[in-house]
From Swiss-Prot:
Homodimer. SUPFAM superfamilies: Class II aaRS ABD-related (SSF52954), Class II aaRS and biotin synthetases (SSF55681). The gene is hisS. The keyword Aminoacyl-tRNA synthetase applies. This is Histidine--tRNA ligase. It comes from Gluconobacter oxydans (strain 621H). Keywords: Aminoacyl-tRNA synthetase, ATP-binding, Cytoplasm, Ligase, Nucleotide-binding, Protein biosynthesis. Coiled coil: none annotated. Pfam families: HGTP_anticodon, tRNA-synt_His. Its EC number is 6.1.1.21. One of its GO terms (molecular function) is histidine-tRNA ligase activity.
Length: 415
């Protein structure tokens, strides 16, 4: 193939791919608004500290995957690798920390330097939601139920499973972390090289390891459930009972963890077996220190993000564009009249195109091939009477219609 190609790990959104993308976003937007969420948009790039502070200097995202550069003013800038940190930054920047709760959703491009594979790109798109100022397990459950409603509206309810875990509070995690570190140190020789590095920097990330030798050790590692204090158990019980009240089914998975201290209590993933190893299509959890890291007060929140590409790949079908209406003018004066009619039809929300190439036969062949529902034919005789010939391309019926009635007739029932 000749010519310039898009960079590795990126792709063009055109045709059906774009329609699928748009359908995911519009479906999610519709559901999110029924829950009272408002759309925000943040810059596609931020001060690098927005992400290095929140994701952790030792995380894979910060150390290996971020697109970071120095701009001409000498500032370190990073293309956003995820959306939550920027939303929390925007909350603080715009003085909204005293106006809680804030129900926010967003969508857009994210960037990570990863190995491209099915459903995973270096420029990818996410849609996410954050309920900032959420203190109860009921709000966590409601936010998860909202995500499930989106998946159901997309027709994916039967293709995904909700996996759920508790991360407890900070005191519970510290007790568990100490037990884990002691266990891993006792078995350090059996850890993979990467996990030995993580043992010193962030031992909880060993739990995310895909290494077979690490997985064997993890099977016998201290169980977090044994280290939950009373407050954490109460929150965990409240979350599960609230999910049941919302009618949300789930499977408990103790291996769902988050490696940063500001995550707490709720962690969840919606997973599918239809995308191979990259089975997570939407994931989230509760966090309690992220706003504080942006210079605001300590505010609890619950949020999630879903990969639009992965969700789009799972769709069985996507709504087609509405059939258009083709105007077929014959003669220079008719072309100008067709332009005027097209403007009126478009103002009424109808899709209208003007066909001017070739003779009448060629024009009608192209109109039929385009999938238009109706053809509007006009020439000098029709202009003189201020009418058009309206042809239904399915039934092949044709009728004379006054120009003034066209938009009403087509809007009411496609004639």
């Amino acid at each position: 193939m000749s010519g310039l190609q898009p960079p590795r790990g990126t792709h063009d959104l055109i045709g059906e791919t774009m329609r699928r993308h748009h359908h995911v976003v519009e479906t999610a937007r519709r559901v999110l608004r029924t829950y009272g969420f408002e759309e925000w948009s943040t810059p596609i790039f931020e001060d690098t500290r927005v992400f290095s502070r929140t994701l952790g200097e030792t995380s894979d995202v910060v150390s290996k995957e971020m697109y970071t550069f120095e701009d001409r003013g000498g500032e370190s800038i990073t293309l956003r690798p995820e959306g939550t940190a920027a939303i929390c930054r925007a909350l603080v920047t715009n003085g909204l920390t005293q106006s809680l709760p804030q129900k926010v959703f967003y969508h857009g491009s994210m960037f990570r330097y990863e190995r491209p594979q099915k459903g995973r790109y270096r420029q990818f798109h996410q849609i996410g939601a954050e309920l900032i100022g959420a203190e109860s397990p009921l709000r966590d459950a409601e936010t998860i139920a909202m995500a499930q409603d989106i998946l159901r509206e997309l027709g994916l309810g039967d293709h995904v499973t909700l996996e759920l875990n508790t991360l407890g509070d900070l005191a519970s995690r510290q007790a568990w972390r100490e037990a884990l570190v002691a266990y891993f140190r006792d078995h350090a020789d059996a850890l993979s090289e990467e996990s030995r590095v993580r043992l010193e920097a962030n031992p909880l990330r060993i739990l995310d390891s895909k290494s077979e030798q690490d997985r064997k050790l993890l099977d016998a590692a201290p169980a977090f459930a044994d280290y939950l204090n009373d407050d954490s158990r109460q929150f965990w019980d409240g979350l599960r009972s609230s999910l049941q009240a919302f009618g949300v089914d789930f499977v408990e998975n103790p291996r769902i963890v988050r490696g940063l201290d500001y995550y707490s209590h709720t962690a969840f993933e919606f997973v599918t077996s239809k995308l191979g190893a990259q089975g997570t299509v939407l994931a989230g959890g509760r966090y309690e220190g992220l706003v504080e890291q942006m210079g605001g007060p300590a505010i609890p929140a619950i949020g999630w993000a879903g990969g639009i590409e992965r969700l789009a790949m799972l769709l069985d079908s996507v709504p087609e564009l509405p059939a258009g209406i083709a105007l077929v003018p014959m003669g220079d004066e008719a072309v100008l009249k067709a332009a005027s009619i097209a403007r009126v039809l478009r103002s009424a929300g109808l899709r209208a195109e003007i066909e001017t190439r070739g003779n009448m036969k060629k024009r009608m062949e192209r109109v039929v091939k385009s999938g238009a529902s109706h053809a509007i034919v006009l020439g000098d005789e029709e202009i003189a009477k201020n009418i058009v010939q309206l042809r239904d391309l399915s039934s092949r019926e044709q009728q004379e219609v006054p120009v003034a009635d066209l938009a009403r007739i087509l809007s009411a029932g496609r004639a």
